[in-house]
Design a protein with these regions (language model features):
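Nucleotide-activated sugar donor-binding and catalytic core shared by glycosyltransferases
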Residues: 1-134
Length: 134
């Protein structure tokens, strides 16, 4: 754990351990997205307030990608070269790093109650429909 906190770059290829690992990151790249594999969940690092980068293959997380990009906390990169350039730019600018991270976190928490709001709306519609049938 202390080694990971001091390392400049940490690469993880694991399941179920990433959420906590994001806490020590400065910036996160979501794998399986530069190749056509659908990407990884960008909301987990965003919840930690980390800027999130990913490739164009985010089919499994389209809504999350759109929310992060709309907020300014996530960014699509077309290839590894562009990823490297973007990471260097963000890591060289602490204010940009912090701003992107805050925007990423805000995007997550603005959408956090979406399921609850949808359920309430559906319940209301069902109640109205039930009354009309009686």
């Amino acid at each position: 754990d202390s080694v990971a906190r001091q390392a400049k770059v940490v690469i993880l290829d694991t399941f179920g351990e990433l959420f906590d690992a994001y806490s020590v990151a400065s910036v996160v790249f979501c794998g399986a997205s530069l190749v056509p594999l659908g990407g990884q969940n960008p909301l987990e690092p965003a919840a930690w307030g980390k800027p999130v980068f990913y490739g164009p293959s985010m089919e499994d997380f389209l809504d999350a990608r759109e929310a992060l990009e709309a907020a300014g906390g996530g960014k699509t990169v077309p290839d590894a070269q562009t990823l490297a350039e973007e990471l260097i730019e963000v890591l060289k600018d602490p204010q940009l790093l912090q701003a992107m991270g805050e925007k990423a976190r805000t995007a997550v928490f603005e959408h956090q109650k979406a399921a609850e709001n949808h359920a309430a709306h559906i319940e209301k519609l069902l109640m109205q429909t039930g009354r009309q049938r009686q």
